A protein has these predicted regions:
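Generic structural hydrophobic/aromatic packing signal, biased to beta-strands
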Residues: 10-12, 30, 46-48, 79-83, ...
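C-terminal basic regulatory modules in eukaryotic proteins
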Residues: 41-108
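Short, charge-rich amphipathic segments
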Residues: 24-35, 80-95, 162, 166
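Glycine-rich, aromatic-bearing surface loops/beta-hairpins
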Residues: 89-174
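A general secondary-structure signal for short beta-strands and their flanking turns/coil
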Residues: 25-27, 39-43, 74-78, 125-133
Length: 174
């Protein structure tokens, strides 16, 4: 996944792999941003969650299939993209932002836009932190058949990232 993201114009800063000892659930996380955004205000966090029960159930189905049969498309892993920006002195209107980003993400990449206003001290002005989340389901059947369209998702994520990088300077100014 990390190498694939690099092929689509992203620069990787960090990667992590977690295994929960009780359930054996695993999460692969990658921190990245567009190549032109190095040193910029935008962070993108990618997380792939692997449930071993889903993987084992998929394996059971595949083992019992005839050689020429395709497995059912019932087994998926969540892939989550989370964009974050630093506190924004002149934060955007959230509804306008959600509408604008819907045009960038299109139907292929539905985006959730949220913000948190916090007060560092009672006498300080509020700080608005912006978060955008996209959730995708990665089909194990399509991966097995070599058809998983992750390229389209990464291209949409790059477009969203570039749009946010272009818009961020106006939100960061006082």
């Amino acid at each position: 996944m990390k190498d694939h993201a690099v092929d689509h114009g992203f620069h990787v800063h960090d990667e992590r792999h977690f295994v929960e000892t009780y359930s054996l659930n695993q999460v692969w996380e990658v921190d990245l941003h567009p190549e032109e955004g190095c040193g910029g205000p935008l962070d993108l966090h990618l997380a792939l969650e692997v449930d071993p029960r889903v993987l084992l159930a998929f394996e059971d189905i595949v083992v019992d299939l005839p050689d020429d049969a395709d497995p059912p498309d019932d087994f998926h892993f969540p892939l989550i993209f989370t964009w974050a920006l630093p506190p924004l002195p002149s934060g955007p209107d959230l509804l306008r932002l959600a509408i604008d980003l819907a045009g960038v993400g299109r139907v292929d990449l539905p985006l959730e836009v949220s913000a948190i206003d916090s007060y560092p001290a009672a006498t300080d002005a509020p700080e608005r932190r912006l978060t955008i989340v996209a959730r995708q389901q990665i089909s194990l059947s399509k991966i097995l058949q070599g058809e998983e369209p992750i390229c389209d998702v990464l291209d949409r994520c790059l477009a969203v990232s570039q749009w946010l990088l272009d818009a961020a300077p106006s939100w960061l100014s006082d």
